[in-house]
Amino acid sequence: VKANPAASEEALLRRLYLDIIGRIPSDDEADRFFASRDPDKVADLIDELLVSDGYRLHQFTWMGDMLRHKSEGARRGDFALYDRWLKDQLKMNRPWNEVVYEMLTAKGSLATSGPAGYLMRDPGMPLDNLANTLTIFLGANVSCAQCHDHPLAQWTQQEFYEMAAFFGSSEVSARDPRKISKNLATNALSKQDLIKVVAQNMASITELGAQELVYPEDYAYDHAKPGDPVVPMLLSWGGDDFKRAAYQVDTENPTELRHSFASWMTHPENPRFATTIANRLWKKNFGIAVQEPVEDMDDPRLASNPALLAFLGQIVVAAKFDLREYQRVLYNTKTYQAEVSVTPPIGDIDDFAFPGPVLRRMTAEQAWDSIQTLIAGTKIDSYETDYSHYVTKFAFPFDDFTDEEIYNTALAMKASGYLTKKERQRGLDLRASALQQPERPDHFLRMFGQSSRELIDDGSLEGNIPQTLVLMNGQIQEMVSARDAKLIRKAKSLDSMDEQVEFLYLSFFSRKPTEKESDRIKQAMEEGTSVPDLAWVLFNTPEFLFVQ
C-alpha cells in the first residue's frame, strides 16, 4: 500500500489543533505558525499544544464518553467531585495505570472521594459495572457472559462470576435517600432539604470483610450449583498468561480482592491493558482503530495490523502509561502527518493499511469548542467550572450518625446557607468540558452527537437534517455572525476587502482563500453581501465541520 503524500501545512495545522486541544486555531495562532521558518515548527507546535489547558480539557471530554461520566447520577447523586478529580489527574498528567488503579480501589462517598465516582456510576449493579470495566480497560467482550456462556466469544459465565468475585467483598451502595428524608422531614426541614444533605453520603463504597458473591439461581453449568460461593479467578487469554508477573496477586484475602484485581488489570504485563488504551487513542487521532471495534479486542490476530497493535502497546508501557507522551509519538509520525484517506467501507475496515488518517467529521465537542473560539476567542481555554464544593460541604459520617444527629446536621447546614440551589453555568464562553455532562437533549452538543453517557463510546459523528437546520437558522449561527462576536468585530476592523476575506478564511478553515474563491467572495461583497452574511456562508460549508 502506498502511503499518502504529506498533508499541506494548512491541513496539518488545523488537524493538530482539533485532535490535541479540541478546537480550530485562531487566526493569530495560524498566522504565527505560517510565519515561522523554523524547520522544527511542527514538532514544537505539538509540544506546545500537549502542555496547554486545551489538551486536558479536550482529553476530558474524550475520556468522559469512554467512562460514561455524568454530572448527575441515580438517587440524586452528584458527581462534581469525580468530575474535578478526573480533570486534576489530567492536569497532573498522571499515568493511566495509576488513574485506573485508584478508580477501581476507591472507598468513601460521592461527598468525600473523587475516584469513587467511577464505581458509583453503576450503584447496586456490580455485574454490569464489571462488564463495563473489562470492556473499557481491556477490550474484553464479556457482557453476554453475565447470563450464560458467550455464544460468539471465548468467555463463560463461570469466568465472568470468578472475575466479579474480586468485587464481592465490596458494597457499592444504591441506598435511596427519599425514605430517611421522608421519615425525618419537619416544617423546619423539608424532605427535599434532607435529600440534598444525605444523598451524597448515602452513595458510597464500603468493604464487607468477606467475599459474598454466589452463583445465581439460574446457574445451569456443572462447575457449581446455584447459591455456591464464587472463588475469585483472573481472566486469561492464553495458556502462558498465568506465568506473567501481572497474575502474581493475592486472590484469597477478601480485604485485598479489589486491590489484587486492580494490580492485575493495570500491570505492564497484563495482556490487554496497554494495547487497549493504545488502540483507543489511535482511533481518536486517526479516525479508525488498528483493531475494530475497540470494545472487542479478545483476539488481536483480527487487528488490521497485529504487529502494529502490539508495538503500540509496547510504546505505552515504555512511556510508563503517560498518555500525553504516547500521543506525542503518534502526532510526530509520517502516517499522522500525511493527507487523509476516505473512510473505507465497513467491510474493508479490518484490512485498512493506514496510508494516512481518515477524513472525519468533528465530534460534537470539537464543533462546539471551535464555534466558541470564533465567538469569544482563545480565552475559552482558561475558563473552567468547578462544582465540587457544592458536594464536599455535605460530607459527614452518615453511617455512624443516629437519625437525630443526621437531622441536626442537616438543620445546621440549612442555617449556614449550604442548601442554596446550585446554578450551573451555561454561557457561550464555556467549552464542552465545562458544561453539564451530558448536556440536555435539545442542546447543540447532543444534536451533533454528544454521547448520552448511557453506553460506552456512545458519541456519534452521523449527520442529520436537524443539524443542518441548527447551522443555518439556530442560535449558534446567530452568535457566530453577531456584531459583538470576536470574529465579526475583528473582520470589520480591517481596512480592505482583501484583508477581510483572508481573515475569515483563516478563521474558519486555517487557510487563505484560493484566487477563485477570493474573486467570487469579493464580487458578492461588492454586490451587497455583508461580513456577517459571509461568515454565515463559510460556517455552513462542509469544510468547516470536517477534520482533514
Segments predicted by a language model, with ranges:
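Short, solvent-exposed alpha-helical surface patches in non-cytosolic proteins
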Residues: 11-20, 467
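Conserved AdoMet
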Residues: 58-61
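Primarily short, surface-exposed interaction patches in extracytoplasmic proteins
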Residues: 2-14, 24-54, 68-407, 454-459, ...
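Long, His/Glu/Asp-enriched segments that create or flank divalent metal/ion-associated functional microenvironments
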Residues: 372-438, 443-472
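Active-site segment of extracytoplasmic enzymes that catalyze sulfate/phosphate-ester chemistry
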Residues: 63-67
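Extended glycan-interaction surfaces of carbohydrate-active proteins
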Residues: 475
